[in-house]
Amino acid sequence: GTSVVLDSAVSAGNILEVVSLAAAAVENPGVLAVDSDLTSTDSGQVIHSFDRAAFRTVKYIVQLEHDSDNKYHSEEILLSHNNTIVGMTTYAQVLLDSNLGTFDADISGTDVRLKLTPTKTNTSVKLRAIRVGA
């Protein structure tokens, strides 16, 4: 809209600040949660995918758990693509007793895929994603 409606009266001399987000758009607000359990150590298991036309960049916070022997692994991943190739960096890695897997990414058809090769069977994946539109 083009008007501002106040909940209460404003007195003379008061300062009123109006911030407009008209130039900004929030698409798919919030953090996407994707959780899964991987029962094998097969290479390149897809743990998340998204339409490459919808999103250009995704930041992930990943937590891997192997509860039966108290092993935990967390890290952040920043991923971006140009519709042909995927660029990805992993950082802020915290390993408690074990490295539970390695990450990779690719484009398959219209999807960008985040993949994991776990080092142990029965690895739980908790993934949180912040997506930025294309």
Regions found by a protein language model. Give the residues of each.
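Surface-exposed loop/edge segments in extracytoplasmic proteins
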Residues: N28-V34, N70-H73, V86-T89
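Ser/Thr- and Asn-enriched, surface-exposed coil loops between beta-strands
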Residues: G1-V4, T41, T110
